[in-house]
Amino acid sequence: VCKHCNSSLGTYVDNYFVNHHFIKSKRQFLRLRSQNGNIPNAFQEGITADGERIRMSADFVPSVVPSVKQEGNKLITHANSVAEARKILSTKLRRLHMPLEKIEEYISKIDESCFQSFQPEIRYDILLDINRFLLEALKIGYEYAVYKFGDRYLDDPTAANIRARLNLAISGKLQFSCEKPPEASYAPEYLISSLGKSSFIGAHYISIASTIHNELIAHVVLFFSPVSAFQVLLSKQANLYLENGQITEDFIDLTQKESQ
């Protein structure tokens, strides 16, 4: 893959997947660092039942997102300290063109007695675009097939269809709307069921097998999770690559990789 294509696939395909809450939470649990060396925080910001935004540190210490709301003649301030409350209230009052001496009078009344501490119940609203997850699986399956079978796979009719869809992604045409890739789906029920019984999530598994219908199928299982377990049709001419019933597979231990 050329530098431009690789960069565009990262922007328009990988980015949605790796930054999704489900994937970030897996990476956070396994302490897998991103390219910038940071461990992702999937729970960085949520909301309370009454809609207040709450930030969560990497150590799961909550703090409010500073804000000022006007309710009638009152200004209600959310802050984490006296200094922070005075600062944001002063900014708000200046924007309301209040005289400086009045601003000083009001903010001087803010002290520790004005604060209420609470243990928030934090909600996270998570939206999953399944088609974009399937697009990620399609890319991984295609790249794995090229890695295993070389240039001869590039001429396969199904490979050409997959490549055409990935080229749409590279061009940015799938940025706002992504249809379901016909070659990709979630993994079959028997595989999903077995994943649900496994407590081991620190690995990726990918395989290619031929079926009795002469189809070349990839199973892409990321973090051993049903949310990221996929099946990709790579070819309708499996006999060109594998004998019936033959399988090629790789197992990537992420915990071992991180410790090296």
What are these regions (language model features)?
Residues 1-2, 57:
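Helix N-cap / beta->alpha transition motif
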Residues 31-36, 252-254:
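Short C-terminal domain-edge/linker segments immediately following a structured domain
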Residues 35-45, 59, 178-185:
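Short, Lys/Arg-enriched charge-dense amphipathic segments
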Residues 2-30, 37-40, 48:
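Short Cys/His-centered divalent metal-binding micro-motifs
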Residues 73-260:
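C-terminal, charged low-complexity interaction regions
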Residues 40-76:
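Short flanking/linker segments adjacent to small metal-binding domains or redox-active Cys/His motifs
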